[in-house]
From Swiss-Prot:
Gene3D superfamilies: P-loop containing nucleotide triphosphate hydrolases, Translation factors. Residues 19-26 are annotated as: G1. It comes from Desulforapulum autotrophicum (strain ATCC 43914 / DSM 3382 / VKM B-1955 / HRM2) (Desulfobacterium autotrophicum). InterPro entries: EF-Tu_GTP-bd (IPR041709), EF-Tu_GTPase (IPR050055), EFTu-like_2 (IPR004161), EFTU_2 (IPR033720), G_TR_CS (IPR031157), P-loop_NTPase (IPR027417), Small_GTP-bd (IPR005225), T_Tr_GTP-bd_dom (IPR000795). The gene is tuf. SUPFAM superfamilies: EF-Tu/eEF-1alpha/eIF2-gamma C-terminal domain (SSF50465), P-loop containing nucleoside triphosphate hydrolases (SSF52540), Translation proteins (SSF50447). Its EC number is 3.6.5.3. Residues 10-207 form the tr-type G domain. This is Elongation factor Tu. The keyword Transmembrane helix does not apply. Residues 136-139 are annotated as: G4.
């Protein structure tokens, strides 16, 4: 049997299940793959296969994540599901699995629980653009009014964290009953098919990396006699064409220059695109005026800052993190893109310390400015060893 070729004819969207433990995230994931497969879109992945998700390491942090894929008539979805609550937190903070949208699974007989709230907050902090709700275990609740109360509570909770609560689609069903249904005509399967339609309609297609504003973190700087200064790195997003104006942002004062050449594997190109490892020739720029840790970007699209708020996860001792807690005034290095910058970290009022394995909202101030924006990921390091991971929630100055 020949291996089937991945046809990229449909738009691709990354999705994930979030929500409180035992509310049915993994059962729902299995049910979706089953009914997508019954319609000829992808293959069924059983509950047990998803539940024993392999461990992955992302920036030194161990995360268990299950990846499944399925299609609808309109789209191809890559879907992540995490077995444990801690895995979700790590996943969202490190950006190991970027989500264009999330399915919030809430059990109708429990209603919103602490992790429901925490996952919504995290989704807001790390920039998940949209959430749809699957109200699970509706077969266990006889009282229509109770279900409506849970829905109202969810709408309020979503609105509180700046999602459009009143416009958020809520699909009622039972993931287990759907998983047990063997045909798509079975009434129990209907909510799953409806959920897939809702994903198609409500979750927006992501902007492709090549359509975003150009940005490349500088990894290295060379001086080529007779040609000038070349900076190398992997283009993070956007497209750079020869002759375009760029800005050098971070660490020093922002300067403008012209990119006079794009090279890849020693060949000259007309343009470099997101994902390419390239060398950019910069007009009139001295070798010592640029350094690793700066970014080359489309002018006016990113600014340097030193002070920000972030959501961080502190590695546990088992993950190779610290053995002891840290307090306000802690001075680690913050690793942004390609470089470490020392900074001082402050904890929110009422939080005395952060223990290894905890996550927390913090404020940090760096000793040198870095090109930054909301949702930028970073690592927290001590002498080259990663002790935490974070994502910027808000820029202060």
């Amino acid at each position: 049997m020949a291996k089937e070729k991945f046809e990229r004819t449909k738009p691709h969207v990354n999705i994930g299940t979030i929500g409180h433990i035992d509310h049915g995230k993994t059962t729902l994931t299995a049910a979706i793959t089953k009914h997508a497969a019954l319609r000829g879109f992808g293959k069924f992945v059983a509950f047990d296969e998803i539940d024993k998700a392999p461990e992955e390491r992302e920036r030194g942090i161990t995360i268990s994540t299950a990846h499944v894929e399925y299609e609808t008539a309109k789209r191809h979805y890559a879907h992540v599901d995490c077995p444990g609550h801690a895995d979700y937190i790590k996943n969202m903070i490190t950006g190991a699995a970027q989500m264009d949208g999330a399915i919030l699974v809430v059990s109708a007989d429990d209603g919103p629980m602490p992790q429901t709230r925490e996952h919504i907050l995290l989704a807001r902090q790390v920039g998940v653009p949209s959430i749809v709700v699957f109200l699970n275990k509706c077969d266990m609740v006889d009282d229509e009014e109770l279900i409506e109360l849970v829905e109202m509570e969810l709408q309020e909770l979503l609105t509180k964290y700046e999602f459009p609560g009143d416009d958020t689609p809520i699909v009622r069903g039972s993931a287990l009953k759907a998983l047990e249904a063997d045909t798509s005509d079975d009434p129990a399967a209907e909510p799953i098919l409806k959920l897939l339609d809702v994903l198609d309609e409500y979750v927006k297609e992501p902007v492709r990396d090549t359509d975003k504003d150009f940005l490349m973190p500088i990894e290295d700087v060379f001086s080529i006699s007779g040609r000038g200064t070349v900076v190398t790195g992997r283009i993070d997003r956007g497209i750079i064409k020869t002759g375009e104006e760029v800005e050098l942002v971070g660490i020093r004062d922002t300067t403008k220059t012209i990119c006079t050449g794009v090279e890849m594997f020693r060949k000259l190109l007309d343009e470099g695109r997101a994902g390419d490892n390239v060398g950019l020739l910069l007009r009139g720029t001295k070798r010592d005026a640029v350094e690793r840790g700066q970014v080359v970007a489309k002018p006016g699209t990113i600014t340097p800052h030193t002070k920000f708020k972030a959501e961080i996860y502190c590695l546990s001792k088992e993950e190779g993190g610290r053995h002891t807690p840290f307090f306000s005034g802690y001075r680690p290095q913050f690793f942004f893109r390609t470089t470490d910058v020392t900074g001082v970290l402050s904890l929110p009022e009422g939080v005395e310390m952060i223990m290894p394995g905890d996550n927390a909202a913090i404020t940090a101030e760096l000793i040198a400015p870095i090109a930054m924006e909301k949702e930028l990921r970073f690592a927290i390091r001590e002498g080259g060893r990663t002790v935490g991971a974070g994502v910027i929630g808000e820029i202060i100055e």
